[in-house]
Amino acid sequence: MAMWRPGDGKVYLPPTPVSKVLSTDTYVTRTNLFYYGGSSRLLTVGHPYCTLQVGQGKRATIPKVSGYQYRVFRVKLPDPNKFTLPDATLYNPDTERMVWACRGIEVGRGQPLGVGTSGHPLYNRLDDTENTSLLAAANDDSRDNISVDYKQTQLLIVGCKPPIGEHWTKGTLCPNAAPAPTECPPLEFKNTTIQDGDMVETGYGAIDFKSLQESKSEVPLDICTSTCKYPDYLQMAAEPYGDCMFFCLRREQMFARHFFNRHGTMGEALPTDLYMKGTPGSDRQMPGSYIYAPTPSGSMVSSDSQLFNKPYWLQRAQGHNNGICWFNELFVTVVDTTRSTNFTICTASTAAAEYKATNFREFLRHTEEFDLQFIFQLCKIQLTPEIMAYLHNMNKDLLDDWNFGVLPPPSTSLDETYHYLQSRAITCQKGAASPSPKVDPYAQMTFWTVDLKDKLSTDLDQFPLGRKFLLQAGSRPRSVAVSRKRSAPTKQSPTSAKRKRRK
């Protein structure tokens, strides 16, 4: 007799629904007003390896300016809600707000192509493990003067928030684990904001060299006490609202030029089953240093593989934010190591006619040149209750910036108000009712500020990027038709042709 019984398999519940993130195209309406904005020529000069103090005061400090630093520009735009628009009926200030949308960008780079080298006068190298025939002599200090050319990198990231970087640093042990000074420290993965002046990943890894390499001779001078950061593309691509990276362009290339090993006591001995011991008393009785480390090289630079000095048009961003500049700000992150030439400057200390090396003083400087151009589109947002609630959940400071606030509940208590506020007979009244000032979320960070509040124009055809935008948009100047009158034809008497008679 057949008998029904419930299945023995597990019952799987449906997954918990996630909150849906809307694309900006669903609640942002684009207008047909476009503006051009461009910076002035942006220049910076400094020492390529370190910050130098040559005297007292701020002007006595020579900043560190290297071709292997991030340049993070914080572009500030005017408030479009305070604009005098050509059409007063374009938007309703009671129910709508205006925002900027980035539609085009061109990052201009001046200066010729060049390769800038870095190095260390006391670089930790023991053997040339590629071409050596004999081991180096055993001594306490085998450091040498080595210079390298770093990995070649070109990078452009555009967003309304600064980019996110990643690097490795020294971690912390558990409380029950007894730390030993001879053990390798634990590593910790960290996400930090990439700021202007941070060092890029040069081929030695994205790590905190100051805390993980205490000898200060494992890498060149400009990074031996710095942190090299690498953009966390995975984190920025997975960002819910897509504010950190509208789009990015990158090009990297590197090869290993020299192969060295490190000098020092091996912190972790090789397992004995990986090698056979040499003859007792010989140089190869015990294996030498197996800490191998190559030196990077970025190879040739060429104008055929340049990412800069050309326009880019934003039609669809990779995230949910399709180019909307919240809080009227835009962050442009640039890395270009193909123009990293370091100037060697020489001055004579005496007027001697013969050359003597000690009579000259040598200096190093590095210069950079930038030019930023943008095309912005004016957009508006219909502030319905649903959209306002969504924007408040996305960023609660956005509505406050638009002068929309949440009204406090009505108070039933009776408040006190003094007549003489400056009187010493009453308690101090300072700060009792003063509103809290707006706090800049990036006040403690370093960026290169580019102010475009007075540099926007609707005359796109008067600027190079504006003409390129009009050309790709299909707008062309109208050709003036010149009417030319044709001269009246002169009447000629028709000539009668006679036929020849056939015989």
Swiss-Prot record:
Keyword set includes Disulfide bond: yes
Alphabetical list of InterPro entries matching this protein: Capsid_L1_Papillomavir (IPR002210), Capsid_L1_sf_Papillomavir (IPR036973), dsDNA_vir_gr_I_capsid (IPR011222)
Q: Which Pfam families match?
A: Late_protein_L1 (PF00500)
Q: Which GO terms describe its molecular function?
A: structural molecule activity
The Gene Ontology CC terms held by the record are: host cell nucleus; T=7 icosahedral viral capsid
Subcellular compartments: Virion; Host nucleus
Q: What is its main location?
A: virion
| Gene3D superfamilies referenced in this protein's UniProt entry, alphabetically | Major capsid L1 (late) superfamily, Papillomavirus
Which parts of this chain are annotated as the region Disordered?
475-503
UniProt superkingdom: Viruses
Asked whether the keyword Lipoprotein is assigned, the reply is no
Q: Which residues form the signal peptide?
A: none
Query: Could you tell me the keywords of this UniProt record?
Result: Capsid protein, Disulfide bond, Host nucleus, Host-virus interaction, Late protein, T=7 icosahedral capsid protein, Viral attachment to host cell, Viral penetration into host cytoplasm, Virion, Virus endocytosis by host, Virus entry into host cell
Give the UniProt record's GO annotations in the biological process aspect: endocytosis involved in viral entry into host cell; virion attachment to host cell
Subunit relationships: Self-assembles into homopentamers. The capsid has an icosahedral symmetry and consists of 72 capsomers, with each capsomer being a pentamer of L1. Interacts with the minor capsid protein L2; this interaction is necessary for viral genome encapsidation. Interacts with protein E2; this interaction enhances E2-dependent replication and transcription activation.
Which HAMAP family would you find in this protein's record?
A: PPV_L1 (MF_04002)
UniProt lists the family membership as follows:
Belongs to the papillomaviridae L1 protein family.
Say what the protein does: Forms an icosahedral capsid with a T=7 symmetry and a 50 nm diameter. The capsid is composed of 72 pentamers linked to each other by disulfide bonds and associated with L2 proteins. Binds to heparan sulfate proteoglycans on cell surface of basal layer keratinocytes to provide initial virion attachment. This binding mediates a conformational change in the virus capsid that facilitates efficient infection. The virion enters the host cell via endocytosis. During virus trafficking, L1 protein dissociates from the viral DNA and the genomic DNA is released to the host nucleus.
The protein depicted here goes by the name Major capsid protein L1
